[in-house]
Design a protein with these regions (language model features):
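Helix-loop-helix hairpin linking two adjacent transmembrane segments in secondary transporters
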Residues: 46, 83-129
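Short hydrophobic/alpha-helical segments at membrane-entry points of transmembrane helices
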Residues: 45-51, 163-164
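A generic transmembrane-helix signature of 12-TM secondary carrier transporters
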Residues: 28, 32-35, 50-51, 117-124
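Residue-level signature of mid-helix packing/kink "hotspots" within the transmembrane helices
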Residues: 1-9, 93-94
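Cytoplasmic helix-loop-helix junction between adjacent transmembrane helices
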Residues: 50-89
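Pair of pore-lining "gating" transmembrane helices in MFS-fold secondary transporters
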Residues: 161-174
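Conserved MFS/SLC helix-loop-helix module at the cytosolic interface between two early adjacent transmembrane helices
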Residues: 5-44
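Juxtamembrane intracellular "pre-TM" segments in multi-pass secondary transporters
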Residues: 136-164
């Protein structure tokens, strides 16, 4: 979860610099590789390392998916689509333990990671084949470190941004406590 929490702050910026499609495909492929690494781990420390890598790459689809919606749509249509996407991502943590329990009952623990390897590789292929690049090169952000730091500092000083993110953090914390208690 630590990798996921930290990297969701950066995927928007990364995709603003390198494009939505490249960032999303790369994220899905890296998640797939991390899942395969977890499945083939021969020690607990390697499993934890691969799980951290999974967390780092897990947030790319959610964050960049929202950016793609924002690129393609505006106004009420964008709001409606973002609400649908948020709802789907909200169901994931609730359904995952149920699906995981069913898989664990019938297959080995490694099978969870093989399934995730396959699903994320398929998602990468689908993005590669069907997702248009929604951020043209002329609209991309320059990858200058000073500009990046300045943008993040500006966001950190923005009261409404910090309030909204604190509310989201508390909501996810509550969800995390619920899921941990259910496990």
């Amino acid at each position: 979860l630590a990798g996921f929490a930290v990297m969701t702050l950066f995927y928007g910026t990364i995709s603003d610099m390198f494009g939505r499609k490249l960032t999303m495909v790369t994220g899905f492929l890296c998640f797939s590789a991390s899942s395969l690494g977890a499945a083939t781990s021969d020690s607990l420390s390697m499993l934890v390392l691969w799980r951290l890598c999974q967390g780092i790459f897990a947030g790319c689809g959610m964050v960049i998916g929202m950016a793609v919606i924002r690129d393609l749509f505006g106004g009420p249509k964008a709001q409606m689509l973002m609400a649908y996407v948020s709802m789907v991502f909200g169901f994931g943590p609730a359904l995952a333990p149920v699906i995981g329990g069913i898989v664990a009952t019938h297959l080995s623990w490694e099978s969870h990671f093989y399934i995730l390897t396959f699903i994320s590789a398929v998602l990468a292929a689908l993005c590669l084949l069907f997702l248009p690049e929604t951020l043209p090169k002329e609209k991309r952000m320059s990858p200058r470190l000073g500009t990046l730091l300045s943008n993040y500092a500006s966001a950190a000083r923005h009261g409404a941004f910090m309030t909204a993110n604190t509310a989201l953090a508390v909501a996810f914390l509550g969800q995390g406590v619920f899921i941990a208690g259910a496990a």
